[in-house]
Amino acid sequence: MNKTVELLGDKAEYLLSHTCKTIDKSTLHLPSPHTVEEVWVASDRNIPTLNSLQRLLGHGRLGGTGYVSILPVDQGIEHTAGASFAPNPIYFDPENIVRLAIEGGCNGVASTLGVLGAVARRYAHKIPFVVKINHNELLTYPNSYDQVLFGSVEQAWEMGAVAVGATIYFGSAESRRQLTEIAAAFEHAHDLGMATILWCYLRNNAFKKDGVDYHSAADLTGQADHLGATIGADIVKQKLPTCNGGFRAIGFGKTDDKMYTELASDHPIDLCRYQVANSYMGRVGLINSGGESHGASDLADAVATAVINKRAGGMGLISGRKAFQRPMNEGIELLHAIQDVYLDPSITIA
């Protein structure tokens, strides 16, 4: 705890002593060593899928806790390889991406069909693979908010992956096509015995209004999580909420006053708790993203995000750029610091 308190600085008391008075923790399905048998056994997931979930939950420094720490490196497509790997060019080589995940103690590594396929025979049995099957590439001009399939569920299965990952840009012009596409892909993945992880991101220029970016609003992101759970995601990945009231500010959708008065407050843990609630009260695990690298503050920022996620009832963190856009030893240190939050029994559910 002492290292976490030191890293949190003047935020320590605010984040570590908060008691959630919105959605009570007793109503949540919280991560535990028995998550698969206590939550997923009751679902329609087949036995091979349960085995894949258990393998993911059982690996790395967080193995057996119910929490996950995943290294995601799909930015070579999403943000261009040059921009992503210029800070540390060793990560142009897929093997170093997988090495960082292994030495960083991660539960799994999430990357592209090409990256993981390049080293699958050497590493698929050493760390769980999550193959990302769709992407938004940055060579089509002008850029459009569309995720297109780069690989198939069968290709992920044949390389020994335990899970497939996909992104839906909720709110974008192509979101309904993406919904039906990924719903079908997730159904097929479950048939083959793989787990499913959905990047539930919002994309619409209208979600920015009066200088406020509502792409990370709790009400909008919570609904995106709910849609992700609806199409069969076992785990949803979401940005940490930074505000609320997106529906009302933009002037669309349906709301209830209690969404903003009783189910959430302006505290980041309560906002994240609202995301957990929308993920079937934690039956579908919520992992928050680490966000872009800002340099010297990355370690403290990552630890703060982990504390918020854990105390809200989330399942873990998926942190990429903060880990790989620096020397490998520093990336390993950052991943371990994130994991230490989930391993610390004194950091409790709010």
Feature-to-residue mapping (PLM):
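Glycine-rich beta-strand-to-loop/alpha-helix junction loops that act as flexible
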Residues: L286-E292, S319-K322
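Short histidine/acidic/glycine/proline-rich micro-motifs that form metal-
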Residues: F170-S172, E292-H294, A323-Q325
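Short, flexible active-site recognition loops that position polar ligands and cofactors
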Residues: N88-Y91, R321-N329
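Hydrophobic alpha-helical scaffolding
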Residues: S43, S265, G295-A296, M328
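C-terminal helical cap(s) of enzyme catalytic domains, especially alpha/beta-barrels
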Residues: A312-G313, F324-A350
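N-terminal amphipathic alpha-helix/helix-capping segment at the start of soluble metabolic enzymes
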Residues: M1-H79, S84, G117-K126, Y274
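Short, highly charged low-complexity linear segments
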Residues: N2-T4, V131, S346-A350
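Alpha/beta enzyme core
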Residues: K25-L30, G63, Q75-I287, A296-G316, ...
